[in-house]
Amino acid sequence: MTQDELKKAVGWAALQYVQPGTIVGVGTGSTAAHFIDALGTMKGQIEGAVSSSDASTEKLKSLGIPVFDLNSVDRLGIYVDGADEINGHMQMIKGGGAALTREKIIASVADKFICIADASKQVDILGAFPLPVEVIPMARSAVARQLVKLGGRPEYRQGVVTDNGNVILDVHGLEILDAVALENAINGIPGVVTVGLFANRGADVALIGTADGVKTIVK
């Protein structure tokens, strides 16, 4: 199976967690896009979705799925999203698609976070994939200096502006042994909006696409 076929398999497998009549939290990226396609088959059975990016919102609406503002939603049963890396503790690096802030907000309010990924995203130690950090534009250089002190090599993601109007620093060269501590440390730097470490709030379920089928891991 190709990587895209593995992504499609986990996207469709996540449908089993969708309850009729509910509002579903939806992530961003190529794997999440397959989940949105699958969700389109439940149009009319679900109340709608809360979306983590303008791109996902557009795709949901094109399939006829109502999209709600998170402020108008009291409860979110599940949030389904991909990952750039996921370790054995169900901690993740996310944000390759620059939607990390909205992804983290929606994940924080959902009862259950379901991570969908192909097997190439599984790692023992996080950090080979550059860690995205969303930053207020005026603080970019100041934040970069602090990230160097934490052992990273920050690189400005040229030409990218997030849906929130901010910029992204991708931090290379990290070997993340204590993801919770690093997430807290980076969150504490003035000017940081969000770091793409999902450690304090990791995944509850991981659906991993492999050549032998979809593997389910429960926290």
UniProtKB/Swiss-Prot annotation:
<keyword id="KW-0413">Isomerase</keyword>
<dbReference type="InterPro" id="IPR004788">
    <property type="entry name" value="Ribose5P_isomerase_type_A"/>
</dbReference>
<comment type="function">
    <text>Catalyzes the reversible conversion of ribose-5-phosphate to ribulose 5-phosphate.</text>
</comment>
<dbReference type="Pfam" id="PF06026">
    <property type="entry name" value="Rib_5-P_isom_A"/>
</dbReference>
<feature type="active site" description="Proton acceptor">
    <location>
        <position position="103"/>
    </location>
</feature>
<feature type="binding site">
    <location>
        <position position="121"/>
    </location>
    <ligand>
        <name>substrate</name>
    </ligand>
</feature>
<dbReference type="GO" id="GO:0004751">
    <property type="term" value="F:ribose-5-phosphate isomerase activity"/>
</dbReference>
<dbReference type="GO" id="GO:0006014">
    <property type="term" value="P:D-ribose metabolic process"/>
</dbReference>
<dbReference type="InterPro" id="IPR037171">
    <property type="entry name" value="NagB/RpiA_transferase-like"/>
</dbReference>
<dbReference type="GO" id="GO:0005829">
    <property type="term" value="C:cytosol"/>
</dbReference>
<feature type="binding site">
    <location>
        <begin position="81"/>
        <end position="84"/>
    </location>
    <ligand>
        <name>substrate</name>
    </ligand>
</feature>
<comment type="similarity">
    <text>Belongs to the ribose 5-phosphate isomerase family.</text>
</comment>
<feature type="binding site">
    <location>
        <begin position="28"/>
        <end position="31"/>
    </location>
    <ligand>
        <name>substrate</name>
    </ligand>
</feature>
<protein>
    <recommendedName>
        <fullName>Ribose-5-phosphate isomerase A</fullName>
        <ecNumber>5.3.1.6</ecNumber>
    </recommendedName>
</protein>
<comment type="pathway">
    <text>Carbohydrate degradation; pentose phosphate pathway; D-ribose 5-phosphate from D-ribulose 5-phosphate (non-oxidative stage): step 1/1.</text>
</comment>
<feature type="binding site">
    <location>
        <begin position="94"/>
        <end position="97"/>
    </location>
    <ligand>
        <name>substrate</name>
    </ligand>
</feature>
<comment type="subunit">
    <text>Homodimer.</text>
</comment>
<dbReference type="GO" id="GO:0009052">
    <property type="term" value="P:pentose-phosphate shunt, non-oxidative branch"/>
</dbReference>
<dbReference type="InterPro" id="IPR020672">
    <property type="entry name" value="Ribose5P_isomerase_typA_subgr"/>
</dbReference>
